[in-house]
């Protein structure tokens, strides 16, 4: 009996001791997602600004939620409902509302092309009468997009632009030049998708009377082949057009198609340019703005194109040059008075500027030796612009709002680290996604003035798991380079670090453009090596 009690006591001691010890991180822990922090994703704000929708892949439904409570309030539609009402069985993996939110464009059987681009079979579901129409191309289509009035859908099929009239199929239209490995209309080539970070190459005008689109001629671009290792025993070979440095790029032109007259206009730019990294309609139905770059990417021009009777009028609206290169962004916003907001690094730092319709500066909205890192938008009701900036430290991000004249600036977040905002339509609410180097993603709902309303996601399970491991915090520091410029860096030392000993060092550096790796934010993988 005494022996048995001794064994029990020893066993309890070992168990308690094991519970008190923290685990060491293994490679398996890192890459199987032990420290993964979940975040809300796929939220789409509805027109009313107080509800959002989420695609529920497990249930095959599009669900409606309240921002204020986080509770589900309705199911917009489900695959089961579509089958019951139309007799057609579909499993959708993407969706898009029309402007009035009474029709849905549903993507099915989606397959990837490159990093961002894909093909799908598309259906249009009418929420009012429960009718279902399929885009009538024989194969999968790209980039289907409902017109502003939702009576037409435009898409790319076999490298050409097509319009399907949902009321009268006899009025379907095709335009642009398309041929595999040579001509593309409405989509973009590999260079634009990868280097300019967009893959949709056409846009409806605000009232749906015109479509502006890209036309590519890649017939002279050299091909590149690459072995792709998939599920098979042997790799498949992927062959595509790829211009290496100094080789020929695609010849690109911008066109405007008049949907009512079924007439195509090529935009004639009066200067020689290499790239058109962005096009965007203004608030006017017949005004398009095209951005152009030279091959060195140090000279940018915004061109205003106006559709007139019998043709197009093109004039230079804004011009900017840089001694090195100019970054491309999606921060161009047109206001109702035809003025526009633009971000530029022309004073040495990226800031917000307000220009009139002639491209003349009204005022610089933000100033200082720091960067505006994101522009969320302009709320015309309150007169505030919302943006993210690295004002306090390049390692961190904070959320601000400021009036159009540059006055009334407010910092909206309280916690120090990495903050990002996701605003509702109309800027009534926003979700703040916060983290730091030692704090997993923590998401909260706020009013537009910064007042916190509720916690959405605290990643408590991840925090509990981290507490069981022997972890060291990141230490941030600065290292001078050859000319004395301080470079930000971080280091993670063992918990029992002894400065008198020598240790092996694992260096991690990525020097690509537009990439920052020294950040005070949570990284579930690289911070746990």
Set out the residue ranges of the language-model regions.
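Hydrophobic h-region of N-terminal signal peptides that target proteins for export
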Residues: 7-19
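Alpha-helical structural elements
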Residues: 8, 26, 185, 235-237, ...
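Bacterial N-terminal signal peptides that target proteins for export
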Residues: 1-7
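Beta-propeller folds
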Residues: 20-423, 428-429, 437-441, 445-446
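Serine-hydrolase catalytic core recognition
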Residues: 199, 223, 280, 285, ...
């Amino acid at each position: 009996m005494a022996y048995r009690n001794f064994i029990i006591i020893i066993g309890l001691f070992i168990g308690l001791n094991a519970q008190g010890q923290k685990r060491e991180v293994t490679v398996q822990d890192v890459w199987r997602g032990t420290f993964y922090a979940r975040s809300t994703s796929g939220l789409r704000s509805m027109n009313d600004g107080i509800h959002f929708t989420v695609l529920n892949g497990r249930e095959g439904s599009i669900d409606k939620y309240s921002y204020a409570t986080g509770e589900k309030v309705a199911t917009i539609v489900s695959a089961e409902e579509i089958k019951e009402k139309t007799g057609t069985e579909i499993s959708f993996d993407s969706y898009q509302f029309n402007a009035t939110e009474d029709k849905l464009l549903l993507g099915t059987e989606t397959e990837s092309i490159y990093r961002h681009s894909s093909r799908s079979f598309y259906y249009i579901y009418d929420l009012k009468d429960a009718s279902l129409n399929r885009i009538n191309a024989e194969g999968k289509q790209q980039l289907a997009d409902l017109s502003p009035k939702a009576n037409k859908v435009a898409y790319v099929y076999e490298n050409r632009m097509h319009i399907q009239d949902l009321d009268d199929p006899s009025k379907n239209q095709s335009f642009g030049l398309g041929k595999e490995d040579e001509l593309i209309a409405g989509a973009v080539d590999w260079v634009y998708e990868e280097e300019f970070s967009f893959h949709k190459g056409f846009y409806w005008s605000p009232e749906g009377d015109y479509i502006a689109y890209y036309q590519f001629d890649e017939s002279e671009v050299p091909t590149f082949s690459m072995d792709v290792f998939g599920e098979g025993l042997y790799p498949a070979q992927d062959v595509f057009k790829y211009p290496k440095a100094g080789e020929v790029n695609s010849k690109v032109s911008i066109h405007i198609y008049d949907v009512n007259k079924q007439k195509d206009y090529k935009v004639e730019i009066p200067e020689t340019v290499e790239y058109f990294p962005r096009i965007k309609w203004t608030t006017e139905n017949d005004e398009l703005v095209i951005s152009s770059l030279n091959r060195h990417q140090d000279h940018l021009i915004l061109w205003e194109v106006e559709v007139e009777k019998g043709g197009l009028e093109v004039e230079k609206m804004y011009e900017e040059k840089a001694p090195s290169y100019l970054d491309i962004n999606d921060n161009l916003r047109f206001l109702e008075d035809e003025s526009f907001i633009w971000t530029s690094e022309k004073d040495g730092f990226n800031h917000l500027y307000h220009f009139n319709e002639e491209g003349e500066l009204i005022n610089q909205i933000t100033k200082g030796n720091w960067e505006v890192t994101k522009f969320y938008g302009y709320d015309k009701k309150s007169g505030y612009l919302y943006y993210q900036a690295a004002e306090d430290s390049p390692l961190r991000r904070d959320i601000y709002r400021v009036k159009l004249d540059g006055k009334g600036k407010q910092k909206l977040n309280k916690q120090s680290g990495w903050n990002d905002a996701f605003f509702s339509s109309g800027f009534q609410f926003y979700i703040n996604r916060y983290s730091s180097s030692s704090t997993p993603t923590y998401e909260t709902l706020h009013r537009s003035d910064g007042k916190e309303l509720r916690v959405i996601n605290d990643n408590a399970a991840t925090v509990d798991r981290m507490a069981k491991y022997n972890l060291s915090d990141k230490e941030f520091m600065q290292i001078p380079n050859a000319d004395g410029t301080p470079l930000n860096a971080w280091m993670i030392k063992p918990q029992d670090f002894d400065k008198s000993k020598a240790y092996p060092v694992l260096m991690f550096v990525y020097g690509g453009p537009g990439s920052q790796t020294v950040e005070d934010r949570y990284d579930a993988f690289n911070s746990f090596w």
